[in-house]
Amino acid sequence: MYEKGEHIVFEVSGPLTILNVLIDPKYVFKGMRKKPELMARIFAKLGKEILAYMKLAKEQGADFISYADSSGGVNILGPKMAEQMVNLFTYDFVKQAGKLADEHTMILLCPKTTFALLGTGKAKLIDCQIHDDRSQEEDSLSYAEACIRMKGKYVLQDRCA
């Protein structure tokens, strides 16, 4: 596909979404409350495997690696547990994942992960201008077109506090 000019997007799920498929989430949430050290080890193990998976995607030519942990949003976890998750896993994981970003590969974060990082003060939002040389009569850039133009210009790890 890449040889034909297509852009490759590889989607990766976070640990809460993965665990949500394997076991009842109430046990994960209970573990986070009662045994945070154990959950930290579990999340670290999953994070290591997810990063290895992302690295393989990059090596195979993925232009974009999209990370989402939809089960980890504030609307599901609540503010206190969402903050715990950011401190326990998400912040360090995103910093490591950001190291995979370069002029060939861009790391995309789902809005829930982004807002969790912003809400805990672990990241800041930077408004990026994209030059669009089309006339005003034409449609504006799509999200995909904007991502393609941004690739290689903004590295994720530089965006975390």
Would you name each region that the model predicts?
Residues 1-161:
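Active-site loop segments of alpha/beta catalytic cores
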